[in-house]
Amino acid sequence: MAGHSKWANIKHRKAAQDAKRGKIFTKLIREITTSARIGDPDPANNPRLRAAVTAALTSNMTRETINRAIARGAGGGDGEQLETIVYEGYGPAGSAVMVECLTDNRNRTVAEVRHAFSKSGGNLGTDGSVAYLFSKKGLLTFVGVDEDALMDAALEAGADDVVTEEDGSIEVYTTPNDFGTVLDALEAAGFKAQNAEVTMIPSTEAELDAETAPKLMRLIDMLEDLDDVQEVYHNGSISDEVAATL
């Protein structure tokens, strides 16, 4: 898990850009609506919905907007029927890339994703080609808190692991199903997460340099600009020096 923050920072940088374009709200609402449609409309009983609601709140979406999206999904009806599809592929320096999509047209989506890979010097793989390199986990990030107190509270709440990064931030890992429970317990104990999400954590990393890092960024940009793409995960590791130039 070491180095997770390095590639997470890329995602957070891109998320900020998306927010400026207004795209992130659209994608969050689609995820909330779909999660409520295919599962329990109560976030407390639906880990996927809870994660989507948490992400929306982190992005400053109002409770009213979130509740409307949940109600629309729970109501079913003739609304947009979307399915989740995950594509796998390879980026520069052999980096592994997973692309999570919500779509109503598989043919359109796979064509757009394949085009992004080919234009960025990567290639779309087959099912299972890189998925084995990732594990789905809940991730809560904290800054400026007492490390020992947080660790005790997190482990008592059922967290899998607690890791202190080089920059002093503390990352708490959970199973996807325990994400909401641990988040609630830590908030009740007075710990406010700077970021909380269910994400894909790589087991190995691909080191990227000043030449290959911009190519990965181009691929991520192209993929996240696609309307059907919800999330992009990768195992590229970029040093602080190289990241500062991006």
From Swiss-Prot:
Record-level GO BP terms: regulation of DNA-templated transcription
Annotated Gene Ontology cellular component terms: cytosol
Gene Ontology MF terms in the entry: DNA binding
Gene3D superfamilies documented for this protein: 1.10.10.200, 3.30.70.980
Primary location: cytoplasm
Xref: Pfam families: TACO1_YebC_N, Transcrip_reg
Keywords tagged on the record: Cytoplasm, DNA-binding, Transcription, Transcription regulation
Disulfide bonds: none
Keyword Chaperone: no
Family: Belongs to the TACO1 family.
Name of the featured protein: Probable transcriptional regulatory protein ASA_2843
Native species: Aeromonas salmonicida (strain A449)
